[in-house]
Each structure stands twice: as C-alpha cells, then as structure tokens.
Amino acid sequence: MNKKIFTLFLVVAASAIFAVSCNNKTTNPTSNSSEKKIVTEEDFKNAIEGLTYKTWAFTGKGKSFNFGSPITVEATSGSDSLAGVEKGFGNALKSALAAKGIDTGNITFDKGGASSSDKTSVSFKFTPKALGTSNFEEKLKSSVKEVEIKLTPKENWGA
C-alpha cells in the first residue's frame, strides 16, 4: 500500500512540475535582430523621390523611374563644386536609400569630362541590394545591374 501511495505521489509531483514548466513565460524577451525589413520597389522609388541635396529637385523622378534608364536631374539654381557634389550628394544618396532598407554598396562617381568651367553632367552609379525578401529583391538580382543618377548644374560647376 505504501508503495502505491509513493508511486502516486511521484506521478502527481512529476505532472505538476511538467505543467508549471510548460506554462513558464520568459520575463525578458529579446528581439530577433536577424529579421530584415522587406523592401519593395515602391520603397526605392520613394527614396529617390525624397532625395534632397542643395538645389537639385528630385520631385517626380522617383515615381517615373524605370530600371535601366538613368535618372536625370537638373539643378533649379546655382551649382556646386565637383568635389562638393561627389562627397555631399554621394552621402545624401546613401543615407536616403539606407533609411528605406536599401544598401547601395559602393557608389561610383563619374565626372566624365566635367570641369569647373562647364555644365557637363556627372553620374553616380551603384548596384542596389534590397534587405529582406521580396519580388523587388528578385528583380534586383536578376535584371538590375546598376542604377545611374545624372546631375546637371544650372550654372558652371564651381571650383
């Protein structure tokens, strides 16, 4: 009889411990930082549309952007030095796209034949990489090799 009571006690105790452990909720949850934001083509276009740098107006450029065609933008007034636009616009572009979850990787600056005494367009080229998984990321991987943004000053490039 004592053996049966002892066995019953062990079964009840084990069941109680199991029930308590299954209901144990963590008191300090941690976020999963490996989860990435899903980036869409609209995010990319909004980032281009929202770009701001000195007197270049990007309004209307993002919404009409087609991959494979350069985005051409003219300054509304004044100009910038070639060195200034290389650093300043390059950083603005990288920041605007990063805010939408798009990695530009290396941005190359091509001044072509531009000099401080002319208005020749300069180009910024990069290959975007979307963070996360989406149809846009697949499109980037399969068809988009490079995005080009051409800037033309209103007046000659400054020194």
From Swiss-Prot:
It is a lipid-anchor. A lipid is attached at C22 (N-palmitoyl cysteine). One of its GO terms (cellular component) is cell outer membrane. Its main location: membrane. A lipid is attached at C22 (S-diacylglycerol cysteine). The keyword Nucleotide-binding does not apply. Keywords: Cell outer membrane, Lipoprotein, Membrane, Palmitate, Repeat, Signal. The keyword Membrane applies. Residues 1-21 form the signal peptide. It is found in: Cell outer membrane. It comes from the Bacteria. This is 16 kDa outer membrane lipoprotein. It comes from Brachyspira hyodysenteriae.
